[in-house]
Amino acid sequence: LKVCGKAIVFGMQESAGLRSSGHMRFFILFLCVASLHARDIRVGKDVLTIHQAIRVAEPGDTIHLEAITYCDYAGFYGKKGAPGKPITLDGHGAILEGSEALEPAKWTEVSPGLFKNDELLPRLDDAITCRWFFLFDGLMQRMGRTSKGKSAPYKRPDELQPGEWTFIKDPSREKPPSKQTFGTFYIRLAAGVKLADANIFYPVRSAGVQFGGDNAHLVIKNLTATHPYNDGFNIHGDCRDVVFENIRAIECGDDGISAHESAQYRVDGFVSIGNSTGICDTGTAQTSYRNIFLARNIGFDLYFLDEGRYAITNALVLSSAQNPFSTTGREKGDCRLALENVLFRRLVEPRVGVIALNSIVTGKRCTFEQLDLKITGSATWEKSVMNGKATATESSAVGADVQTLLKLTPPDFRP
């Protein structure tokens, strides 16, 4: 199937994908040779789905995707390679698409151009709806809302303009103590436009790449996550020796990438554009990022919390978020962030970054433009420049290597 000229491979349940006896025999044979040696597992050729490929992969194996768009996600739940023999997912430029086309038959026209749906997803809660968006003709419409930061109130249905949407909660359907919520989504089209012709997509997956449980010795590289209702790369649990290389998170409902609990990983090559938050790491996570580019994020650009240990080296941040930079720790333990060779360039009105209590930031060769910092925690700067002035008494403070960092800008990026 092709959508907008791109090849699409839809994820499917194993039970559906293996119904034919021929597929079943091949799949069993594939499992039998799994332990013989490191293999190349090609999704679409050797196995039908990304899920199947991850399930059968053993230490040393490489899962290969194609440079196409997959309406699917990559979930790692208790998956482990071995020291020196990681399991690798190589996207080869693949896109993991979190949205799907709206189904006109499931919507009711309540007045000319105004449509509603009472059960858009099987389950909703406030964490989902606060991240929600629709895509109208490929353009992301958040309605001024973001999961982290200030959000516009929902409009009344009669206030909607063409290309807008709203959500009206229905508390009468809720069943405490369940956090599940209910309500109705409304969308407005221009006069005379049929819903079937409107080219509207909505998010149906929570992430592009997701971790849960204990994972170890994994490499994920060369792929893009886009349009999930939560994070592009949603990393939960206790992971060790995990590497991400050349990854991108584009227009995700919440964070481009986010570490939770005690996750440990490193990233070399990351692009985060148009997300609610560029990077948000929490808990006792230990993460490092190298060669990263952030732009057009909404709520926060960089947000580091709790008792984690975090590092960023070689970063270009083109900031337009409500909250450009924030670190905050806990009373029982501090948050620590090390910055090196970072250019933080504010593109819109100046804002204040926050280094809050129980957080410690060290910066070496950093440049901040149009950004002041409110520091109630601890900050130490070396060879760094803040709004054209050295952050210390050093006469040799030249800041970040701007010309080199500007090369991190993706070739297809337009400010």
Describe each PLM feature range.
Residues 29-38:
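Hydrophobic h-region of N-terminal signal peptides that target proteins for export
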Residues 2-8:
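Extreme N-terminal basic, low-complexity initiation segments
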Residues 8-9, 20:
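Short, positively charged and aromatic/hydrophobic N-terminal segments
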Residues 23-29:
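Sec-dependent signal peptide recognition
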Residues 15, 20-21:
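Serine residues within intrinsically disordered or low-complexity segments
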Residues 42-44, 48-227, 234, 403-414:
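Extracellular polysaccharide-degrading/modifying enzymes targeting complex plant/algal/animal polysaccharides
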Residues 199-204, 215, 219-222, 227, ...:
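Extracellular beta-rich repeat passengers
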